[in-house]
């Protein structure tokens, strides 16, 4: 009798020795798929669950006369200019399922940003790192939005807890109440993002309203869940750092007895990924958040009885 086929999940990265994604030294698993499309996103390759291609011009050897990818794309998405440089029609490329360009490239200039794992395969990768965690580490599921692949994630979480692996999640909480509650039954620690308290401004920069996000956070905070929750705010000057928005976050936290928040200053580390995906990065001219301003925001939270950590400074 054949065994039942295991669920597969799409993963775009697995990082060992992570020290900023929850208590202790951790393994962080990045799952594909996200309901948001934040204009500052550092991982835009994670937005879709299905595999898709990225192109790195810096890795491409077209200037040295390489032609191994010529004629490989049967869909007509790949052409070449007079300098032999690949030119990609992303509207055609986004529907590709064969990825001949990726398979032909010797230099990893074309690469896929999703890899399938079965439940057991991923759990084996996680367990492999367990000697690095010491006594207080574990696994953190990030993304993208890990809750989009909730069936796969649920099976992985169950197997992790079978062998007493501490589980954490980084999530936008932008999923149905049913999915959110089901997954959090097996979560020990959580970072949940709040991008903005105003629903219209939230939609303007992320593509979705924040009603479901705030509802899930509130429900979790008022449930019998016994894990640890830290809210996270990606601080972006001129978007969500106003006195009004900070005050609204504090009011929301007080209302729901939430006591910890992490302020993450905006950065442009993901800009090159947008280029590799053929996307325009609207935040290329956005400046860094002033350190003095971050300290002022931190003081406001502290003065209101909320533990506030800036950047990767956390109470682990």
UniProtKB/Swiss-Prot annotation:
Residue ranges of every copy of the 4Fe-4S ferredoxin-type domain listed in the record: 84-115
Substrates-to-products reaction catalysed: glycyl-[protein] + reduced [flavodoxin] + S-adenosyl-L-methionine = glycin-2-yl radical-[protein] + semiquinone [flavodoxin] + 5'-deoxyadenosine + L-methionine + H(+)
SUPFAM superfamilies according to UniProt: 4Fe-4S ferredoxins, Radical SAM enzymes
Keyword field: 4Fe-4S, Iron, Iron-sulfur, Metal-binding, Oxidoreductase, S-adenosyl-L-methionine
Binding sites annotated in the UniProt record for [4Fe-4S] cluster 2: 60, 66, 69, 105
EC number(s) per entry: 1.97.1.-
Annotated TM spans: none
Binding site for [4Fe-4S] cluster 1: 34, 38, 41
Entry keyword annotation includes Iron: yes
Binding of S-adenosyl-L-methionine, residues: 40-42, 144, 193-195, 267
Entry keyword annotation includes Transcription: no
Domain of life of the native organism: Bacteria
Listed Pfam families: Fer4_12, Radical_SAM
Cofactor binding mode and count: Binds 2 [4Fe-4S] clusters. One cluster is coordinated with 3 cysteines and an exchangeable S-adenosyl-L-methionine.
Boundaries of every Radical SAM core domain copy: 20-307
GO molecular function, one term: 4 iron, 4 sulfur cluster binding
InterPro entries in the record: 4-hPhe_decarboxylase_activase, 4Fe4S_Fe-S-bd, Aldolase_TIM, BssD/PflA/YjjW, Organic_radical-activating, Organic_radical_activase, Radical_activat_CS, rSAM
Reported cofactor(s): [4Fe-4S] cluster
Complexes and interactors: Monomer.
Function: Catalyzes activation of 4-hydroxyphenylacetate decarboxylase under anaerobic conditions by generation of an organic free radical on a glycine residue, via a homolytic cleavage of S-adenosyl-L-methionine (SAM).
Family to which the UniProt record says this protein belongs: Belongs to the organic radical-activating enzymes family.
Protein name: 4-hydroxyphenylacetate decarboxylase activating enzyme
Species whose genome carries this gene: Clostridioides difficile (strain 630)
Highest classification ranks of the organism: Bacteria, Bacillati, Bacillota, Clostridia, Peptostreptococcales
